[in-house]
Structures are given as C-alpha cells and as structure tokens.
Amino acid sequence: MKTEIVEGWPQGHEIRILISETNASQVNAIRRALIADVPKLAITRVDFSQGVTQDNKGEVVESVNVLPDEVLAHRLAMIPIPTNLEEPLYAPDQCPNCKDVVERDRGCPMCQVLYTLSARGPSADSEEEYKTVYAGDITTISDPFYDIRDEHKSIPLTVLAKGQFLEFYAFAVVGRGRDHAKWLSLIHISEPTR
C-alpha cells in the first residue's frame, strides 16, 4: 500500500490522500477506523432558558421558536466543533475529576467545553419580521480555540419572530463516531472520478 498527499493539499482543514497499490478491503478498513475511532468534540447536552422576560426597553419576550427544543438540540449536536488533539480533553467517564460523579453532574474544564447563545427576534418597531440564528452566534465560555470556525458559522439553527428569544448553555464532550454520528470526525471519503 502506498499513500501520498495530493498536490495542492492540505487546504485549510481538509486534506486529500491518494492510496494506491491496494485493494478495496484495505481502504475500507482505514475508512472504518477513521469513522469509528478518531476522538471528536460534539454538543451532548443543552440547557434552554424557559419563560417570559422583559428586556431593557420594557419589551416582553418569550422563549419560544419555530423548532421544538429537542430538534434544536439535535441541530446543535451536528455542528462541527474544533477538536484539539494536541491537548485532548478526557471523556467524562475517564476524567479524574468527574468519573465518580453522577452523569448529570459531570463536567469540568478537563472534560467539557461550554458554549452559550443569547439571541432575540426583531424588536417590535423593526421592519423585519424574522431573524435567523446561526451557528456563528454561539460563543464559547471555554478556551477560544473551541470557537465555531468561520466556514461553519453560516449554518442556520432556527428563526425567531418578534417577541421571541433563545437562550441556552450547551455542553460539548469528546466521543467517537462508533457511539453516535455527532462524533464523526470524517466528513467525506471518495474515489477520484475516472
């Protein structure tokens, strides 16, 4: 088996590798290992703010939007989050600080990354009827390394109308693709066109 990086690559966060003098089963084994075993960060828990509140201008806003919280949480889980393989985080069940703690209470800087979002729909006097909330509106409370990358900031999450707001804390932990699709580190493998 011979491998070589295709000329002109890597580009940004992508790479193309040409594998030759091999058969499909060997390449498939590599593909399956990359899918199943490479550690990746993904959002696993989201705590939404609920209720009605009043903003600084006295306008009453409610924490509702067009998507149920469960659907929005699933979308958040699928957002690509940078993973630092140089200084990896522990899996929560292996973290020295959290492994003996009840699952709901697990989480520390050694095993999770914390994100937050606070967005509201257009104000009552605005001409706009709706505002789209994007992945780029999410900010990290942890290390800035884990900020959503520019190429993923335009992923739409939901739409807010006048009088609506969305506020949450999201918790990302390390996992592997064999456990859930949100931890897939590999986006695409393909054969060159012939």
Question: How does the language model describe each region?
Answer:
Residues 1-190, 194:
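Protein-protein interaction/assembly regions in multi-subunit complexes
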